[in-house]
């Protein structure tokens, strides 16, 4: 009963906060708040300029490699396990996957900025 009450209260509170967050910004729409801010100066140009897909691809590549590196961080603690052979096999597979994905990005010219 206590668990159900806690889940209900947490779900209700989260739902109310999400509804308020979507409802409040629609009440007061100011042009000053909607305009871009450039360190106190008037904007030089439009803030809605399109950007090249290279930025997006570099960001996605960074996130993927960052995630794979984060998976390698617990390896020093995993080396203290009793089954060292399994840990080394998994680490080798993960490092091989990281190297293969880097080689794929390199061959597909995903790391080159100039076209």
UniProtKB/Swiss-Prot annotation:
Q: Please, one GO biological process term?
A: mitochondrial electron transport, NADH to ubiquinone
Instruction: Supply the name of the protein.
Output: NADH-ubiquinone oxidoreductase chain 3
Whose protein is this, by species? Ceratotherium simum (White rhinoceros)
* Recorded GO MF terms: NADH dehydrogenase (ubiquinone) activity
One GO CC term, this protein? NADH dehydrogenase complex
How it assembles, according to the record, is: Core subunit of respiratory chain NADH dehydrogenase (Complex I) which is composed of 45 different subunits. Interacts with TMEM186. Interacts with TMEM242.
Provide the topology term for how it sits in the membrane. Multi-pass membrane protein
- Where does this polypeptide localize? Mitochondrion inner membrane
Keywords of this entry:
Electron transport, Membrane, Mitochondrion, Mitochondrion inner membrane, NAD, Respiratory chain, Translocase, Transmembrane, Transmembrane helix, Transport, Ubiquinone
């Amino acid at each position: 009963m206590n668990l159900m009450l806690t889940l209900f209260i947490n779900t209700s509170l989260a739902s109310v906060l999400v509804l308020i967050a979507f409802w409040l910004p629609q009440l007061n729409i100011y042009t000053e708040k909607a305009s871009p801010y450039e360190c106190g100066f008037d904007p030089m140009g439009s803030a809605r300029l399109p950007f090249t897909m290279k930025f997006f691809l570099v960001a996605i590549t960074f996130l993927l490699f960052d995630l794979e590196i984060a998976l390698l961080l617990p390896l020093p603690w995993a080396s203290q396990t009793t089954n060292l052979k399994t840990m080394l096999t998994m680490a080798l597979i993960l490092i091989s996957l990281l190297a293969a994905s880097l080689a794929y990005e390199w061959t597909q010219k995903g790391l080159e900025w100039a076209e």
